[in-house]
């Protein structure tokens, strides 16, 4: 009987080691505002921007397309559809930059990308991936806006 009781206690204590625990800092209001699931995560779209097929190099044309690209980035941030954007250092895969879009479907992402002049002119080519990450990602934008000194 003692050995049966010892085995039962061992099984129960082992099971509790692997069970989920609740977060004492959990803020249900914030989680709901950010669209978080029970794990504090949500679906996003990751876009990798590659060098496009358009090889035009006239400075005025390229500058105009990329000015539109930057204006579109700012517009998407203001409407809370773009959470992360930035260039990548030169690499052998011709990856130029990334976006993390605050949308859940590829169709929504494609609609947003249609508004980017550098993509429309095929100076950049997007690769679209579904991504699952922290729902709190959008919270960094307020801090990010307070730490830059100069614009590009």
Question: Model-flagged regions — what are they?
Answer:
Residues 20-152:
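Conserved, structured core segments of small domains
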Residues 1-22:
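Bacterial Sec-dependent N-terminal signal peptides
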């Amino acid at each position: 009987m003692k050995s049966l009781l010892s085995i039962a206690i061992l099984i129960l204590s082992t099971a509790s080691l692997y069970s989920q625990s609740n977060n004492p800092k959990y803020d249900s209001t914030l989680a709901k505002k950010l669209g978080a699931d029970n794990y504090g995560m949500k679906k996003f779209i990751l876009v990798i921007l590659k060098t496009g097929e358009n090889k035009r190099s006239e400075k005025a044309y390229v500058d105009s397309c990329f000015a539109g690209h930057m204006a579109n980035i700012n517009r998407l941030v203001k409407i809370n559809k773009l959470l992360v954007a930035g260039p990548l250092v030169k690499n052998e895969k011709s990856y130029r930059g990334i976006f993390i879009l605050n949308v859940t479907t590829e169709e929504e992402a494609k609609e947003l990308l249609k508004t980017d002049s550098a993509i429309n002119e095929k100076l950049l080519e997007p690769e679209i991936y579904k991504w699952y990450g922290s729902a709190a990602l959008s919270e960094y934008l307020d801090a990010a806006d307070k730490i830059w000194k100069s614009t590009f």
